Amino acid sequence: MEDDSLYLRGEWQFNHFSKLTSSRPDAAFAEIQRTSLPEKSPLSCETRVDLCDDLAPVARQLAPREKLPLSSRRPAAVGAGLQNMGNTCYVNASLQCLTYTPPLANYMLSREHSQTCHRHKGCMLCTMQAHITRALHNPGHVIQPSQALAAGFHRGKQEDAHEFLMFTVDAMKKACLPGHKQVDHHSKDTTLIHQIFGGYWRSQIKCLHCHGISDTFDPYLDIALDIQAAQSVQQALEQLVKPEELNGENAYHCGVCLQRAPASKTLTLHTSAKVLILVLKRFSDVTGNKIAKNVQYPECLDMQPYMSQQNTGPLVYVLYAVLVHAGWSCHNGHYFSYVKAQEGQWYKMDDAEVTASSITSVLSQQAYVLFYIQKSEWERHSESVSRGREPRALGSED
């Protein structure tokens, strides 16, 4: 394991680890040890997103934010239905959710990537750009998704929609890296995809003997929620950030006092994603059987209670897509999705069938994956649509 010594604001030492995973909060990205918490000024919802810039120096900014348009370039009408090519409902449901992700769709329709990409063939960003453009510009039609979208994944049978979704997101992230494969891990997290879907966990361990504190940061692209004991998404999030006691055989080896001592471990979201992907863990890892229970989820979700920084005001997200599984096992059943189109109308996207729906129907589903976008970003998007304004940069000021 290779360690690099870096500094946060000139005072906190990092120990960097070479292996990263995007969705597991227990995989370390960077660790800080100190004897007490420093004073920090309150942060706004807008500035909190940029905290990841302080985790480590960025050697190279792979996707400048001024090149990520947030305002809409999309047609007003809902787009095309997708043809099922044989057990590909999981592909179609996932693609529809990504197609109606505002910052991703706006970037794809800007053709920013294809104008500079030298790969084209085998590039997931180019493939997704072609798909999203076709889907959104062919309302009332049914189109056939390119086989390249599921190349290397689809094996002619029913697959897990969430696994395909993250396979696609990861492939798009890798497509941002040609020519930059030797950059450091933190710079890789400045890609277009991480700017849209990414954030950072903070795992904080406090030694109860010397009160020393160790912070570990890890990037994420989605958040998995255990729903076994939860009746709502909020309850599942509360369980996720609930402090854990480390004692007895599980006592903590403190790097400050160098003793094995009882400690408290707390996981929180250090930086918030522009677009939040919440996956409800409905399937058993062993049997694949489904947890077929109703888990309530809101149209508007305040993520502030689960953030590292408290007392900074609400951090509200709005629901814009829901991926649903109908059936009793991950090995069979049917996937479809609900998406919120540009004008605010909800639609059920069930392979080739596209039908208008209501928020009441959307909120009554046994959801598998939920897609939320920061309310401030959605409002900027909606405002630009109503005023017919030109696309603005992600994170730019009015």
UniProtKB/Swiss-Prot annotation:
CDD domains associated with the record: Peptidase_C19E
Domain USP: 80-375
Localisation: Nucleus; Cytoplasm
Reaction equation(s) it catalyzes: Thiol-dependent hydrolysis of ester, thioester, amide, peptide and isopeptide bonds formed by the C-terminal Gly of ubiquitin (a 76-residue protein attached to proteins as an intracellular targeting signal)
Active site: 89 (nucleophile), 334 (proton acceptor)
Methyltransferase in keyword set: no
Cellular component GO terms, alphabetical: cytoplasm; cytosol; nucleus
Superkingdom of source: Eukaryota
SUPFAM superfamilies: Cysteine proteinases
Pfam name, any one: UCH
Effect annotated for changing residue 89 to S: Abolishes enzymatic activity
Enzyme class label: hydrolase
Primary subcellular site in the record, as a coarse category: nucleus
InterPro entries linked: Papain-like_cys_pep_sf (IPR038765), Peptidase_C19 (IPR050164), Peptidase_C19_UCH (IPR001394), USP_CS (IPR018200), USP_dom (IPR028889)
GO molecular function annotations of the record: cysteine-type deubiquitinase activity
UniProt keyword Nucleus present: yes
Family that this chain belongs to: Belongs to the peptidase C19 family. USP17 subfamily.
Chain's role: Deubiquitinating enzyme that removes conjugated ubiquitin from specific proteins to regulate different cellular processes that may include cell proliferation, progression through the cell cycle, cell migration, and the cellular response to viral infection. Seems to be non-functional in the regulation of apoptosis.
Protein name: Ubiquitin carboxyl-terminal hydrolase 17-like protein 6
Organism the protein comes from: Homo sapiens
